[in-house]
Amino acid sequence: MERKDIATPSRTKALLDQFGFNFKKSLGQNFLVDVNIIHKIIDASEIDDNTGIIEVGPGMGSLTEQLAKRAKKVMSFEIDQRLIPVLKETLAPYDNVTIINEDILKADIGKAVKTYLNDCDKIMVVANLPYYITTPILLNLMQQDIPIDGYVVMMQKEVGERLNAQVGTKAYGSLSIVTQYYTETSKVLTVPKSVFMPPPNVDSIVVKLMQRETPLVSVDDEETFFKLAKAAFAQRRKTINNNYQNFFKDGKKHKESILKWLEQTGIDPKRRGETLSIQDFARLYEEKKNFPELEN
């Protein structure tokens, strides 16, 4: 007898009943129950039988199942121990799936990739990300030395819009800068609340992030560069001059240096962080090397 797709309301409900599973709000559990949405996610990821997949938060395996049919291998991180027996049953037909019962933020992802996906030509992150930790997960993956080619991920609409936001818009901020520094970003589709069980309180969006061959700008210390950019958005309604006076050690004392630094970079101190492009921040970063008194 042919197995029914996991991503239907009836099959998901049957599994919930079979395993006596109750959703944990603290883990942001909202299971996808529309296989058409899943196919659109997978189509956008352009995976083939040489692709290795990193998935985060497989839930009951609705996306995992469809990924396993098209990818070479799927490696899924699931933090909730209660879902492991469910996944062992739902994904039993697929010997190309590895479930890792760990917190993705604490796991040695590089080691796991070498262990399970070393023979894959391409590696993609494809996931319905837990909404409460979407940003930490993405930043953690992007900033590690892992050969990831791209990401097709579902997340809260508001967060997705920030990833793809253009300079000068309300959604543009430090998260936009980090993601666009590493990747080319685009929107795939908006997802209604009705395709989840239980329905989330927020609208959802699928975003595609393809790794750049080289970062958008060249800096020699990414961590310091990102801190400098983030500081400009500390209080969005304040000018970059005010934000940097609060950011640097003894910033008030060095306010003349801050003004000179901004002016020598060709940036009006009265501007707000949201008006500065990634290239502007790269110029600020380079020029700051001439002002050793500006420390944080």
From Swiss-Prot:
The keyword Cytoplasm applies. Its main location: cytoplasm. S-adenosyl-L-methionine binds at N30, L32, G57, E78, D103, N128. Pfam families: RrnaAD. It catalyses: adenosine(1518)/adenosine(1519) in 16S rRNA + 4 S-adenosyl-L-methionine = N(6)-dimethyladenosine(1518)/N(6)-dimethyladenosine(1519) in 16S rRNA + 4 S-adenosyl-L-homocysteine + 4 H(+). InterPro entries: KsgA/Erm, rRNA_Ade_diMease-like_C, rRNA_Ade_Mease_Trfase_CS, rRNA_Ade_methylase_Trfase_N, rRNA_adenine_dimethylase, SAM-dependent_MTases_sf. Its EC number is 2.1.1.182. Keywords: Cytoplasm, Methyltransferase, RNA-binding, rRNA processing, S-adenosyl-L-methionine, Transferase. One of its GO terms (molecular function) is 16S rRNA (adenine(1518)-N(6)/adenine(1519)-N(6))-dimethyltransferase activity. Gene3D superfamilies: Ribosomal RNA adenine dimethylase-like, domain 2, Vaccinia Virus protein VP39. It is an enzyme of class 2 (transferase). It is found in: Cytoplasm. Disulfide bonds: none annotated. GO terms for cellular component: cytosol. PANTHER family: DIMETHYLADENOSINE TRANSFERASE (PTHR11727), DIMETHYLADENOSINE TRANSFERASE-RELATED (PTHR11727:SF7). Belongs to the class I-like SAM-binding methyltransferase superfamily. rRNA adenine N(6)-methyltransferase family. RsmA subfamily. NCBIfam families: ksgA. Specifically dimethylates two adjacent adenosines (A1518 and A1519) in the loop of a conserved hairpin near the 3'-end of 16S rRNA in the 30S particle. May play a critical role in biogenesis of 30S subunits. This is Ribosomal RNA small subunit methyltransferase A. It comes from Staphylococcus haemolyticus (strain JCSC1435).
